[in-house]
Amino acid sequence: MARSLPRRPSTPTLDRLTTDERGQLLGELLVAHPEVAAEAERLAVSRLATVDADEVAEDIEWTLREADADQLSYRAGRVRGRGYVHVDEAAGEILQELLQPELDDLVRRADLGLHDAARQMALGLLRGLANCQHDVEAGTVLAYAGPDVTDDLAWCVRDELAEAHLDLPEDLPEDLLEDVSAGSDLEPEA
């Protein structure tokens, strides 16, 4: 007879908690049961240390390609308190705002000492940005931002690595290396 895995107990209320409620509950459990804190920390490190650069690349490429072009009507043209904002400037700002959470995640991992994960995150972001240089559809935020926007965003990734005192990933493709490190003191790690 085949041995089955133990069944997870039914937890209908837990299953319906929001992300915030789950976070609060985890905090309460760790206070009530400090003996599980070390295991929770180990699991957290394990989760944050694992980054799939290809998945990051796909995610950021999709996010930037699917940016909501309708926002341009609110952010370009005459804007109260800013004067006239060109459509390419507004589009670049939208893309920068979409990239920022990923940059924050890269910095978070670097600050935790998870340098390989931060490098893989950077590699994925750079690959995704490079992919966005091709086959840009007219009428998208990427198209309105102009052909240099992905290079500008790649410099943001490079700058975050530099601030974290990290080198570019070893497996950075040469075409990305030329674009991102031109004129930079950063070199791929040996």
Where in this protein do the model-derived segments appear?
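Eukaryote-biased, non-catalytic alpha-solenoid scaffold regions
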Residues: 1-12, 20-24, 31-190
